[in-house]
From Swiss-Prot:
Gene assigned in the entry: ROD1
Its biological purpose: Functions as a phosphatidylcholine:diacylglycerol cholinephosphotransferase that catalyzes the transfer of the phosphocholine headgroup from phosphatidylcholine (PC) to diacylglycerol, a major reaction for the transfer of 18:1 into phosphatidylcholine for desaturation and also for the reverse transfer of 18:2 and 18:3 into the triacylglycerols synthesis pathway.
InterPro entries assigned to the protein according to its UniProt record, in alphabetical order: AtPDCT1_2_TM_dom, PDCT1/2-like
Source species, domain of life: Eukaryota
Species, as recorded: Arabidopsis thaliana
Annotated protein name in UniProt: Phosphatidylcholine:diacylglycerol cholinephosphotransferase 1
Enzyme Commission number: 2.7.8.-
GO molecular function, one term: diacylglycerol cholinephosphotransferase activity
Chain residue ranges for the region called Disordered: 1-39
Origin organism lineage: Eukaryota, Viridiplantae, Streptophyta, Embryophyta, Tracheophyta
Chief place where the protein resides: membrane
Amino acid sequence: MSAAAAETDVSLRRRSNSLNGNHTNGVAIDGTLDNNNRRVGDTNTHMDISAKKTDNGYANGVGGGGWRSKASFTTWTARDIVYVVRYHWIPCMFAAGLLFFMGVEYTLQMIPARSEPFDLGFVVTRSLNRVLASSPDLNTVLAALNTVFVGMQTTYIVWTWLVEGRARATIAALFMFTCRGILGYSTQLPLPQDFLGSGVDFPVGNVSFFLFFSGHVAGSMIASLDMRRMQRLRLAMVFDILNVLQSIRLLGTRGHYTIDLAVGVGAGILFDSLAGKYEEMMSKRHLGTGFSLISKDSLVN
């Protein structure tokens, strides 16, 4: 490092944080003072140190840059650990789940290539499958009711755009069904044994369909999330209950694997979020008019 390199003192200070009541692991750079004697550029930090910054990086850095300091875990105390377990028990549960399923995964016997997939949802709904198999009329009625629910989802999602002028749910559904088509065609899962089809089920007419992932569940999630956004909480609760009943029926009729339904929930949340980001991005491009799928000129005319 050249002796003529310019050096700048950068001080890092310790600040309290609500995570553990003591400190955080971030880095704070104390900048200059503004007109009100407030520091500019402060962020949370863990320790009080001073480093030299030169033209080639930080003098205290390792490997051409970065900070040479104590590892974060070396400052942990028993009080910190108790705090995390007490107030952040959800991540702790997931950590325990990670360890548990690592043991399950590495000791579980793989399903033979010519065997039917194991599905825990099918095991739980075995009795429902037998009831529906022995009562075709009941199966038809439940399929018809499920189709009505799909119609309710579709109507609501289209309504939010055509009538209320809010396109987020519609965009999310377009994203979701396009992605579902790509994934469903890319990996075409075998139809489960004991599948109970119906001519009134959606898609109507006993036509073929993609198993992965469930568009029924994802569409319901998109509608429910929009309802919550608009404070239609009771309607959202009704949709969530119907979505659970729909999932039980789909497992009972072997219309979807459990993983199809679980990913359907995640897909609904994901594509609703992506649609929101799309709206935000387009709004920034059109700062004067905001986001709209329809030209503002057409609304005036």
